[in-house]
């Protein structure tokens, strides 16, 4: 095993989101961050500027290929939730890919409409030579970040979690 000092450094551009007052240095990542932080139902029409027509997208609930399917997922988000918004908290980019960490904030439409909910997650994105996203994989814990917050199901999830710890 090499001593730590003998391992050559890796060139990685660490990006700070624009929300923190610093502009990212990776143009494709900067464009994606700006797009998602300003996402509205009206801007869904601009998804083709961000994604390729054959984009692969996966999150805990969906696994799809194609721009129209991705558009459908985001349109459903606006139908099901009140005031959904993404806040990018960090970004690491290297070459043709980046990893974003983010907070997804929203209110439920059908219950507990007063409480702001936050899901913390991350996205692995791969870009084409033209800077469009061709691969988008979201990582977040649906059990902890969503199911535990739902009435009835939340109680069951917390009980199961406690049982698993024993």
Describe the role of every protein-language-model region.
Residues 27, 69, 117:
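Soluble or luminal CAZymes and related metallo-dependent hydrolases
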Residues 1-45, 49:
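Short, low-complexity N-terminal intrinsically disordered segments enriched in polar/charged residues
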